[in-house]
Design a protein with these regions (language model features):
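Active-site phosphate/pyrophosphate-binding segments
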Residues: 10-14, 18-46, 136-265
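Glycine-rich phosphate-binding loops that contact phosphosugars or nucleotide phosphates
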Residues: 40-189, 269-317
Length: 322
């Protein structure tokens, strides 16, 4: 029940996090601690995290590279800490953790500091170890999260990452003033869009009741949709105890598609217009092998119903933040 409660708290958590850094229509990172000069000097961004926070990092990598035009590497903190990483002294290491106490993430932070690289923690718990030890801190204002499976903390971590990407892009001259204002306005619409999605729960509950005996579930997507698929699959495992995997849709043909048989549930995530047709063709390929298809896309892409057995639509959003 805590999880249901926290799902419904997402709009407020996202809104609170945005309001903490958006002042008079502009992003203000003064409380985070990074100066404009420091942001201009960053040569590369490294992101370390575990679990759902790692999936945030995967999404952030796509957005930051596209907007900021800077190399971004995202890595599991549990791998990063043991492999003696080579870090650029002018790089920035971003560590994402809800609790701020995740052991592997904390170790990755300490390794980065040992190498003299600037660090930034995206954390939810004020005064936590990562918050204390990182050079800079972006607090997500999700409030206490009791459920084991993260919901509102995950959403606020995404928003924090997107906010950083927009501000970095502006400071480094990669986007115009008009784009900057547009992206900020787009972020401000997200809490209301989350509310609308949550209200549309009856169809999803009906669908879930029909699929309750599924043995294997595959989530597929491309680009940011792949990052979302990773999180969707983890949630499916954590909450339903049903075996689930996430794949970049283009990788299905390299062996995985042989696991799809009659009735296998395949959930396609298609929020990226430029990749929509590609992912749809992967879904059609799955259907030819007997898969039951669910499509998750934005309003307007109604042709998905020609192939998907069940479709879910979410409000249109700038593809970076979908």
């Amino acid at each position: 029940h805590f999880m249901i409660k926290e799902i419904h708290e997402q709009p407020k958590a996202v809104s609170d996090t945005l309001n903490s850094v958006i002042k008079d229509g502009m992003i203000d990172l003064s409380e985070v601690g990074l100066s404009e000069e420091e942001i201009k000097e960053i040569s590369q961004i490294y992101i370390g995290a575990c679990g759902s926070a790692y999936h945030v990092g995967v999404a952030a990598q796509y957005v930051m590279e596209d907007l900021v035009r800077i190399p971004v590497r995202v890595e599991l903190a549990s791998e990063f800490r043991y492999r003696n990483p080579i870090l650029d002294p002018k790089g920035l290491v971003i560590i994402i953790s809800q609790s701020g106490e995740t052991a592997d993430s904390l170790a990755a932070l300490r390794e980065s500091k040992k190498q003299g690289v600037k660090t930034l923690g995206i954390v939810n718990v004020i005064g936590s170890s990562i918050a204390r030890e990182a050079d800079n801190v972006f607090y997500t204002l999700a409030g206490p999260e009791i459920a084991v499976a993260t919901t509102k903390a995950y959403s606020t971590q995404l928003i924090a990452s997107y906010t950083l990407a927009i501000q970095f892009a502006k400071i480094r001259g990669q986007i115009t003033e008009e784009q900057y204002t547009g992206y900020i306005e787009e972020l401000k619409t997200i809490p209301d869009k989350i509310s609308r999605i949550i209200e549309d729960k009856e169809r999803l509950q009906w669908f879930a009741s029909k699929q309750v005996n599924a043995k294997d579930i595959f989530f597929i997507g491309r680009g940011i949709d792949y990052a979302i698929s990773l999180e969707g699959s983890l949630k499916m495992k954590e909450i339903s105890y049903i075996h689930s995997e996430a794949y970049a849709a283009g990788e299905l043909k390299h062996g995985t598609i042989s696991l799809i048989e009659d009735g296998t549930l395949v959930i396609g995530v298609l929020t990226q217009p430029a990749l929509y047709e590609k992912t749809l063709s992967n879904m059609v390929e799955c259907k030819s092998r007997g898969a039951y298809l669910m499509g998750l896309t934005t309003f307007g892409h109604y042709n998905i119903e020609e192939n998907a057995d069940f479709s879910v639509y979410i409000p249109k959003t700038d593809p970076h933040f979908a």
